[in-house]
């Protein structure tokens, strides 16, 4: 069956029908993308779903476990069309299922995929007890400088990107009093993390960062556990994407009771 453009509503129904519980965690970004009724979606109705908010935003590609060759060809064709419109496109999919699609899209487009970030996907259904040093606090006005600093440290250390001081200051100002961002205080502010999005029964945690001189002491795990507790109390399943190349952060998440649900990898094209 050929892929065709579908509406966000059709994509939501397809995801509910075809994705397993674990896949819905791995592709939690669909819940954010598909909040937009004008989201760009394509599917064959059974074996693949491609979705992005706009032509220049990251494309997420779900592929069924048993992927027929015809469906693989169609998914590759859809990906190649997206690359023709935006060669700088970033694409995220299951690396084990997606190699054929990547190869065929490369043949069609003349571009080569390059790994940006392999990610382990975690969900927390029950917290494990954790000894605590310090406590979580809601950000106050006096925390603006440290929030801006932590954001810039995270972007530079994790992604090699510089966040302009003005942008970091704007972020910090917006987060004062937020019910979605928490700081961990143990004498000084040691870590920061936030609930980035809530949808489809899940709460996605990101922007997890520990102050450089405080790393390796468990603060990120303690703070993530506090956010998980908050989400679980609301009947939501906490989830997050973790850099597969950072074993210490993965251990921290596992220690608080987060369970691995699968892997996805982000690619860019050259």
Predicted regions: what they are:
Residues 1-26, 127-162:
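Short amphipathic alpha-helix that is part of the acyltransferase structural core
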Residues 2, 28-87, 193-206:
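Conserved donor-binding loop and adjoining core beta-sheet/short helix segment
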Residues 53-55, 163-166, 170-209:
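A conserved beta-strand-loop-helix scaffold within acyl/acetyltransferase catalytic domains
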Residues 55-57, 63-133, 267:
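Acyl-donor-binding surface of acyltransferase catalytic domains
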Residues 64, 211, 215, 243:
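Residue-level recognition of the GNAT/N-acetyltransferase active site
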Residues 69-82, 210, 216-233, 250-255:
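Conserved acetyl-CoA-binding loop-helix of GNAT-fold acetyltransferases
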Residues 92-99, 239-254, 266-270:
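Conserved beta-strand-loop-alpha-helix junction that forms the acyl-donor binding cleft
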Residues 102, 106, 252-253, 258:
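Conserved active-site tyrosine of GNAT-family acetyltransferases
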